[in-house]
Amino acid sequence: MRLTPACIFLDTNVYIIGAADSESPESRILEWVGFGRKGSAQVEVVVSEELLEQISRVARRLRNKDWGGELLGRIWQNLNVCYVLLDDQEYSELELSGVIPREDIGVYLTAKAGKAGCFVSSNHKLIRVLAQRTGEFECFTPEEFVNQYLL
């Protein structure tokens, strides 16, 4: 096990899958960052309005709006949150460049603005793009992150 990063970004799918499936690697990551217990957070977790809206939207679609509210409440109450604002100009430039898939620009900019050391996502396409083209942070699937840092 390596020294764990001080600041990480967790993609929408990590929150949704982790909250829905207690046996998943995503759930293990959420437990590690303190999602289930107030005051237990050691690591800083980067979030933005865009990420929180995605979590709420997906949770509402999969279950209901109450579950979405519960997830957001746990993020704000239990995690050591680093809230960042996204730069509209940078968003537009990335959209025009085509380097990062359009639907993933917001999550990328969130991790970048928060100076995350790690980016964790089940989105394999996004991880490959970020790792190959930007190299700004270590990119992991939830399984890779658990194996690298939590075992």
Which residues make up each language-model segment?
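Residue-level signal for well-ordered alpha-helical positions
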Residues: 21-22, 58, 133
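Alpha-helix capping/helix-boundary segments
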Residues: 14, 51, 106-107, 125-127
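Active-site neighborhoods of divalent-metal-dependent phosphate/nucleic-acid chemistry enzymes
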Residues: 81-119, 128
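Short, well-structured N-terminal submotif of metal-dependent ribonuclease cores
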Residues: 1-47
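Short His-Asn-centered micro-motif
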Residues: 10, 49, 120-123
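Short catalytic/ligand-binding loop motif for oxyanion handling, primarily in non-cytosolic enzymes
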Residues: 17-18, 54-55, 127-130
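Acidic, PIN/NYN-like endoribonuclease modules and their adjacent C-terminal/linker elements
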Residues: 2, 117-118, 124-151
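PIN-domain endoribonuclease scaffold, especially VapC-family toxins
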Residues: 33-94
